[in-house]
Amino acid sequence: MTSFETPNNFEPLAFEQDQSRNIDNDPFTLTLDDVSKEANRNKYKIIPKELREQLWKLHFENQYTDLLELLEHIIPLCEDDFELFFLAGKSSANLELYQKAMMYFQKALYFRPDDYFVNFEIAKLFHQAELHELAEKTFEVCSHLEPANFEPVYGRAEALCMLKDYRGARPLLKRVVEIEPKFTRAYELLAVCYIQLAEFENAHNTLNYMISNSHTLGKAVGSSKNLKQLCHMHRLTTCMELGLFDEGRTSIQEAKKFVEKFSQNIALTSEARFQLALANLRLGQTKDAWGHYFHRFEQQDFPSPKRKFTRPRAENISELTGKTVLIWREQGVGDEIELCGLLQEFMLKSGATVILEIDERLVSGVTRSHKNIVVRAPEYDKETLYSAYHDFDYHMPMADILTFLKPNKSIKNCIAPWYKVDTEKAKNWDQKITSDSLRIGFAFGSHFKNAKRDKHKHLNFSLFEKLIKNSDHTWVNLDYTWTDLEFNAIDEDIKSKIFFPDIDLKNDFEQLAAVLTNCDLVVSPYMAVRSLAGALGIPTASFVRGAPYHFDFGASIENPDTFTSPLVPLSTVKQFGDQLETEEFEASLLKHFEVQIEKAEKLRGQ
């Protein structure tokens, strides 16, 4: 995201009155002493034109400190002068005195509430203060004041993106490029919106347009000199999601050139490195991926908090022999469960003693399962992000296990069910979930939703209704996203075939694991319950749309057949193209689940 420049069509009022004077050659000079003497002598309420021009001269020469000092002496004598308040606000803002700037702009607004420039400056202040809702509303006011100006429309779109309202930002960005077809940042942000809304084809087309016109767009004000390579960086996502692997390889080469050119500038290349890592992992090119993946936390907008420690971050596995390393959670609970399956292999290869900070919902189960590891919930200052503990030599975010082991598809030889369930709880659920046939656990959604997750990780219960209706099996509900309306709408015949465990399915992983261990098969989207089932050794049937995520190490992504997820034992994951229509997708997924149920039936009969 970028901050806004001063509107380039703003002209000071004094210059509008008289353009004939050459201020640079004007013998009139201004000092604080001059202002005080002149003020005391004349007691003016309307300052002389020469003085006004000299104030603007200081502004255009970026002499903000001197200018503000002068204005603070003049303003008490001219309290109804809009222009002075505006200049004081601009000077304060440029000196990063944001509260003072807001005070002056508000006073200017009192005299001219419909002035575009004052409203625009106030919107910029809200933007800089990360008060995105106020920024969006104020930019909206500006866009009404000057409908033909693209800057406030873009400002409003940017604020909405900061609020994660990509659907609201999308039409505004389209409007921006209609007004100003060469405004590169709008195309860039529009592509990001499309990606966040899982509209990958639209994003791909936008990026292709930018690449095709990079010679022209690259000359526009505010454009990056590396526009073409940056577009290819974003295009890695769309190519992988749309299955355009040949185009993806072209974008990989362009993004690599950018990273190599600026190899010493980690901050500049961090996002490109991350996209290169994911693309290579999705293509199964793990050798080229893990070095880039290590730098994921250098990204400005990386979603996981970058925690702070008094000990250094581990940079290679060889330095950990005989040392104590703190491994801390960085991603979702499903990823944590999967990575826990690599802990023993990591300890074997590194020779390190491990302290593991993990989601508090997993602490008891992981402690029972990995007795040679100290397991605890994270504890750190929520403002500074500094850890409360110092009992280790090195720290590392949890997915660094992957960057150190550098796994490929052969890693599945090191993976085995590892989660040890509470046996008493498991026996209790075995008695409660009665069935003469299969016990099939199912889930269809996650509580955390956005457009991308809805496409990749969310189903409607109606799909499971079709499976349950003609089934003689007992279906065990593992989903906690039911609404009362959805639950009450279930046909009673179907509801009679479903066992609803009376537990907190979202937070009580001890009870959830005990329920899962009594299932013959778990059917769900690509989510945490699937990961926990795999850690228990329960067969799972799942799916992905587009290219698999990086924890699958690119297994068979160029083949639409079923593949096995290496980190989840006995996991069957069906891959579907992103462009499948909903009906075609659901019909194919239904068939996939039916096949896995048939396999479970045969396994039970053996």
Task: Give each language-model segment a name.
Residues 1-521, 526-530, 534-606:
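Alpha-helical solenoid repeat scaffolds of the TPR/TPR-like class and their adjacent stem/linker regions
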